[in-house]
A protein has these predicted regions:
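GIY-YIG nuclease catalytic motif and its immediate N-terminal context
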Residues: 1-74, 79-81
Length: 81
């Protein structure tokens, strides 16, 4: 099973980071109001970054790393992917 760390851009230009086994399905869930509370309040969202990782634990670690980054770094990550 594949695991992914992803980042979406919210309607308020903020970035939300999470992990999933299916990034496309997860973005649809966010946009349908079945995602995280933050994205329900600041949707719709657009997928801007996806990174495949080894397993669930690696996904959690990478998610935490990305969440610690500043907004400018997240903007650069989104622009490159």
């Amino acid at each position: 099973m594949a695991f992914f760390c992803y980042m979406v851009k919210c309607a308020n230009d903020a970035y939300y980071t999470g992990w999933t086994t299916d990034p496309i399905r997860r973005v649809k869930e966010h946009n349908a109001g079945r995602g995280a509370r933050y994205t329900r309040m600041h949707g719709p969202v657009e997928l801007v970054y996806v990174e495949e990782v080894e397993d669930h634990i690696a996904a959690l670690k990478r998610e935490a790393e990305i969440k610690k980054l500043g907004h400018a770094r997240k903007v650069r990550m989104a622009a490159v992917s």
